[in-house]
């Protein structure tokens, strides 16, 4: 009996000792478990969801696009049409109207691809010829990290810029070029002047592509030539206004004066229509300038107020 009790006591002691040993080893397991989330963290970060367009930004860019369309048709057409002689009124209206329609088509065919794809510092590629790969799900970068808009609305917004830029040139040689010559000139100028300038000034991969110094260097190297040099054209001062001004100046110089200039009356057809066109241009410019921010935030509001006040002050100074 004593041997049996001694054996049981020894067995219980060994079980107790092993239990204590297991209890002492147990805290090591949570430590290992605690390491698991840390190891999984990079995987979670890599699996972060892609940015999704905000409905408010998308709605604002849609409205801004419509406003810029109104600048060209009918704003610019009426502005120029009212300034020319009565016999050329319909001609100028049709020139602006058809030039805009033609540029929208050319932009869709190859313009967007040449201006907004990675190629070299001066031209893009034909990777998005006829909007290849541009779908309702594809996105375009803005100026803020994590903020994107649908690429389709970006395509449309930029198309309106191209159209009004070519339309602006029409006024430089109004009444002095045949309709077919105007269309040919605008098609060639759009291809060999507007598109490379747009690529050089505006093309880059967006802020989401920049994560460190190395990626910044890579984005800069792939950007357009003037963008890489630090140029910031917020709303087309270079791509639209300077570009169109140079094209119009050279065109007017090459064609020369109107026949009868300084010898016969060249009274404008209707200053009323010119006033209506100017008013539509002012209204459309809110979409042109504020929409160039590509998102609805305080910077867009600042551009909106600047457009309102600056134009009002210019009007008073002109009066």
Regions found by a protein language model. Give the residues of each.
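Hydrophobic alpha-helical transmembrane bundles of multi-pass membrane proteins
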Residues: 3-8, 13, 22-319
């Amino acid at each position: 009996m004593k041997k049996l009790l001694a054996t049981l006591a020894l067995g219980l002691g060994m079980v107790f000792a092993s239990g204590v040993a297991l209890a002492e080893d147990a805290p090591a397991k949570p430590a290992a478990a605690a390491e698991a989330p840390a190891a999984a963290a990079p995987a979670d970060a890599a699996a972060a969801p892609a940015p999704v367009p905000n409905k408010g930004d998308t709605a604002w860019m849609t409205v801004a696009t419509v406003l810029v369309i109104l600048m060209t048709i009918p704003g610019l057409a009426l502005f120029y049409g009212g300034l020319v002689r009565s016999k050329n009124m319909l001609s100028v209206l049709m020139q602006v109207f058809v030039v805009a329609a033609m540029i929208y088509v050319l932009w869709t065919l190859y313009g967007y691809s040449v201006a907004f794809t990675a190629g070299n510092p001066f031209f893009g590629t034909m990777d998005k010829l006829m909007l290849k790969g541009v779908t309702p799900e594809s996105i375009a970068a803005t100026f803020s990290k994590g903020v994107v808009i649908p690429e389709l609305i970006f395509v449309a917004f930029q198309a309106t810029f191209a159209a009004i830029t070519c339309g602006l040139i029409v006024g430089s040689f109004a009444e002095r070029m045949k309709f077919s010559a105007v269309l040919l000139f605008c098609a060639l100028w759009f291809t060999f002047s507007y598109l490379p300038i747009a690529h050089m000034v505006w093309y880059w991969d967006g802020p989401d592509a920049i994560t460190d110094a190395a990626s910044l260097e890579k984005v800069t190297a792939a950007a357009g030539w003037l963008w890489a040099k630090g140029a910031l054209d917020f709303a087309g001062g270079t791509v639209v206004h300077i570009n169109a001004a140079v094209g119009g100046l050279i065109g007017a110089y090459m064609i020369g004066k109107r026949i009868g200039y300084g010898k016969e009356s060249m009274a404008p057809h209707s200053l009323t229509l010119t006033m209506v066109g100017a008013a539509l241009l002012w209204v459309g410019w809110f979409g042109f300038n504020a929409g160039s921010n590509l998102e609805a935030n305080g910077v867009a509001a600042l551009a909106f107020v600047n457009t309102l006040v600056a134009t009002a002050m210019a009007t008073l100074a002109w009066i």
